[in-house]
A protein has these predicted regions:
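Phosphate-backbone binding interfaces of nucleic-acid-interacting proteins
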Residues: 1-202, 335, 351-352, 357, ...
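A carboxyl-terminal module marker
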Residues: 2, 433-439, 446, 455, ...
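Glycine/proline-enriched, intrinsically flexible loops and inter-domain linkers
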Residues: 5, 28, 62, 186, ...
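Beta-rich nucleic-acid/ligand-interaction surfaces
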Residues: 39-43, 199, 484-488, 510-528, ...
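Conserved mixed alpha/beta core segments that line enzyme active sites in large multi-domain catalysts
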Residues: 46-76, 239, 243, 250, ...
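Mobile "lid/hinge" segments at catalytic clefts and subdomain interfaces of large enzymes
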Residues: 111-123, 132-136, 305-406, 558, ...
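Terminal amphipathic helices with adjacent charged low-complexity linkers/tails
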Residues: 182, 186-211, 386-414
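Extended, well-folded interaction surfaces typified by the phenylalanyl-tRNA synthetase beta subunit core
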Residues: 407-564, 753-755, 765-788
Length: 788
């Protein structure tokens, strides 16, 4: 949005320089791209050509004697329209123009002391200019005063700020909106807009019928003027349009653009004599065709809004009118449209057809009061500058609330959100500056927000306004003091992370999105997966249920780069749908492969028992000692059936442990997956503490050869029972399978730790317990003690 200082001064007079105004607007949230003069040229004067002779050494150059008020200068000029008696724009030596600095010089042997200028050479964009303004010097009126500033005489002495507005501030896409914003900053009142005009005879309702057949047009107004004279616009209108970035065309077209810039409401004019007896609004038909003002045939869809008459579509609502009802130079009678259309549909159509100043305003939403205002302002200007006569009556379709919004808010809430202490009077004064009316109700204030501020709808919007006008720079920075406490789940997860890190595992963080084909792997659970509607790739198309596929991708990434010793864990979310309800579970997943450094100070190949030991460390740490057990049932097919188990606590399955099936990979990969969300629902046993023994313990190893179908868990139960209270710790540290042990046999080795809190154990005592353990295991499991 380009803000012309001269334009906005009709409504508010600000004495600050243009850069200060721009900075203050930025201070309340309205950033600008540039600020400066419309014509950035200096040392220019109005001159009169006293003599004009052909250059002695050129067939197109002229040697002119030019009166500039203080002296007569000789200037060589190549413009075809230069002649004696012409009033011209003279750039004196030292003048700064967009094309460079003007200096005294010699042109083909003749001295030249300046330059006679065209409007184009002053820096105006060619799109604003006529052909003669580009190809020849500018011809000033005969009454132009010699020696005066031509920029001021031409009323081009304007200043412009080019703003980069946020999408929510559609109200600032108007001079009036900018005036109200400046009024709030400078505490100045905004002048009223002139809407006066004479009411003529007759009534438009007797000539034209309005039909609105779609909810996409909540407000539509139409009025008529007759006996219009189409001619060049007054200078001030043309210059203000140029300053705003719009090319002047003629007085009628320029007035429609002028009113749009002034009020923010786009208008459209129809040639009334070509319109017919019906004016309506409807949705377009698929493949319907319309020739627009740019003489382009458009193929429409049923999401486009069209204006129509008895013959068919005559305009693309909010975008561009149709060629069949175009206002031309011989047009005498005009029907004026001022309306509001669905902003979403306008944006959709504008992206297909044309982005314009009008569509930009429709897309951001319009104030219905301005729709009426723009109509009246248009009649006012057409009457003044196009000699129009207004026809009585107005066609009106209204299905929209035009009331101002009322929002009640507590003073304390404003201060709490802003983090400052403003007294009641300061807050009320800020609302007054914004032209909001208020009703003080003690602890709260009822604020009536003008309908032009469509961006304000809730209490927090009012807080933002107070903060903006008070000044963000005036709000002192404070350290945030928040009563944040870490939740129980977060504490537990952090503790698990510390534990596993101390056990030598590395934490990883993987994508929650995986291939759809992997979602139902590593589980036998029944659920529906959650797929993205429009995934970027199939690799990241579906939210995961198990984290194992994610960790396997990390494993593949590492092994492909030569790292084969991988011990990872992740705590992350899993996602699924059951009975049309979406769920999220938190899971702990561990992957181990290659070499693992154990407590004995030696590197050992990862096996099931090392993995199981990590699992039990976690479960014991969480307080589930002696409550978990394993079952070789309900196992996913991706795990090796002989080296895997389901994990249970209190008859509830909480996870799985096992080796990845050889059909999936030949690598020895072991995984654990625990559903932490399920564990939260299982009451943790009260932690019991016992005094650390003052006396040393004794560690002994024992190994058995037994049937390979006997689990280590069964053997551990037997060892615990035989070992009694003095056996305080049991760990499986080796599994050995070899043909020398027998076809269906395996060797299990256990580390046993004995301790008495009251004394030092003797060798005889340990030997007695040790022998009892060996005998009981041999009897119960048909095992043999392995001696080597």
């Amino acid at each position: 949005m380009k803000l012309s200082r001269k334009f906005v001064s009709d409504y508010i007079d600000i004495n600050d320089d243009i850069n200060t105004i721009a900075e203050k607007m930025t201070g309340v949230g309205n950033e600008y791209d540039s600020a400066g003069k419309l014509i950035n040229a200096s040392n220019l004067v109005i001159g009169e050509v006293l003599e004009c002779d052909m250059h002695p050494d050129s067939d197109h150059l002229h040697v002119c004697k030019v009166n500039v008020g203080t002296e007569v200068l000789q200037i060589v000029c190549g413009a075809p329209n230069v002649r004696k008696g012409l009033k011209v724009i003279v750039a004196l030596p030292g003048a700064e123009l967009p094309g460079g600095t003007i200096k005294k010089g010699v042109i083909r042997g003749v001295e030249s002391n300046g330059m006679l200028c065209s409007i184009a050479e002053l820096g105006l964009d060619h799109k604003f200019l006529k052909e003669e303004d580009i190809n020849g010097i500018h011809e000033l009126p005969e009454v132009a005063p010699v020696g005066e500033d031509p920029i001021k005489y031409l009323e081009l002495d304007d200043e412009v700020i080019d703003f980069e507005l946020t999408s929510n501030r559609g109200d600032l896409l108007s001079i009036l909106g900018m005036a109200y914003e400046l009024g709030a900053i400078y505490d100045e009142k905004v002048n009223d807009i002139d809407l006066s005009h004479k009411e003529g005879i007759g009534n438009i309702k007797d000539e034209l019928e309005l039909k609105v057949d779609t909810e996409a047009c909540p407000l539509f107004l139409a009025r008529k003027v007759v006996n219009v004279t189409i001619k060049e616009s007054p200078t001030f209108i043309k210059n203000r349009l140029i300053a705003s970035g719009i090319r002047p065309i003629n007085n009628v077209v320029d007035i429609s653009n002028y009113v749009m810039l002034e009020t923010g409401q786009p208008l459209h004019y129809y040639d009334a004599d070509r319109l017919g007896s019906t004016l309506g609004v409807r949705m377009a038909n698929d493949n319907e065709e319309l020739t627009t003002l740019d003489n382009q045939k458009r193929t429409l869809s049923n999401s486009d809004i069209v204006i129509y008459n008895n013959t068919g579509a005559i305009g693309l609502a909010g975008i561009m009118g149709g060629l069949s009802t175009e206002v031309e130079n011989d047009t005498k009678n005009i029907v004026i449209e001022s309306a509001i259309f669905d902003p979403v549909l306008i944006r959709k159509t504008s992206k297909k057809v044309l982005r314009s100043e009008a569509s930009n305003r429709f897309e951001k939403g319009l104030d219905p009061k301005r729709t009426y205002m723009a109509m009246e302002r248009s009649l006012n200007l057409l009457e003044k500058y196009a000699s129009a006569t207004v026809v009585g009556g107005m066609l009106e379709h209204k299905n929209i609330d035009i009331k101002d919004k009322e929002i009640e808010i507590a003073y304390s809430k404003i201060n709490k959100i802003l983090g400052i202490e403003l007294n009641k009077n300061t807050i009320l004064d800020i609302f007054r500056k914004l032209d909001f009316t208020t009703l003080d109700k003690g602890d709260t204030v009822l604020v009536t927000v003008p309908s032009r501020r469509i961006d304000i709808a809730i209490e927090e919007d009012l807080v933002k306004e107070v903060g903006r006008i008070y000044g963000i720079d005036n709000i002192e920075g404070r350290k945030m003091i928040l009563p944040v406490r870490m939740g129980k789940v977060d504490k537990t997860n952090r503790s698990i992370r510390h534990l596993l890190s101390n056990l030598g595992l590395s934490e990883t963080l993987t994508y929650s999105l995986i291939k759809e084909s992997e979602v139902h792997k590593y589980t036998n659970d029944t659920f529906d997966s959650i797929r993205l509607q429009d995934p970027m790739t199939e690799e990241r198309s579906t939210l995961r249920y198990s984290l194992i596929p994610s960790l396997l991708s990390v494993y593949d990434y590492n092994t492909n780069r030569g790292n084969n010793n991988i011990n990872l864990f992740e705590i992350g979310k899993s996602y699924y749908v059951k009975d049309n309800i979406h769920y999220e579970d938190e899971k702990l997943t561990i992957l181990m492969s290659g070499t693992y450094y154990n407590k004995l100070g030696s590197n050992r190949e990862v096996n099931y028992y090392i993995t199981k030991g990590i699992l039990e460390k976690v479960l014991n740490y969480l307080g589930y000692n002696n409550r978990y057990y394993y079952r070789k049932e309900d196992l996913p097919k991706e795990l090796h059936p002989g080296v895997a188990a389901s994990i249970y606590i209190d008859n509830k399955k909480v996870g799985i442990i096992g080796k990845i099936h050889p059909n999936v990979t030949k690598d020895n990969i072991f995984v654990i997956e625990l559903n932490l969300s399920l564990l939260k629902d299982i009451k943790v046993s009260k932690m019991k503490y016992k005094e650390i023994s003052k006396f040393p313990g004794i560690s002994k190893d024992i190994a058995f050869v037994l049937d390979k179908n006997i689990t280590s868990e069964e053997v551990i139960k037997t060892i615990k029972k035989a070992g009694g209270k003095l056996l305080t710790k049991i760990e499986v540290f080796d599994l050995y399978v070899d043909s020398s042990l027998g076809e269906n046999n395996k060797s299990l080795a256990f580390s046993l730790y004995f301790e008495d809190p009251n004394k030092t154990l003797t060798l005889d005592e340990i030997t007695e317990i040790f022998d009892r353990i060996a005998i009981d295991v041999e009897k119960k499991h048909n095992a043999k003690l392995r001696n080597n």
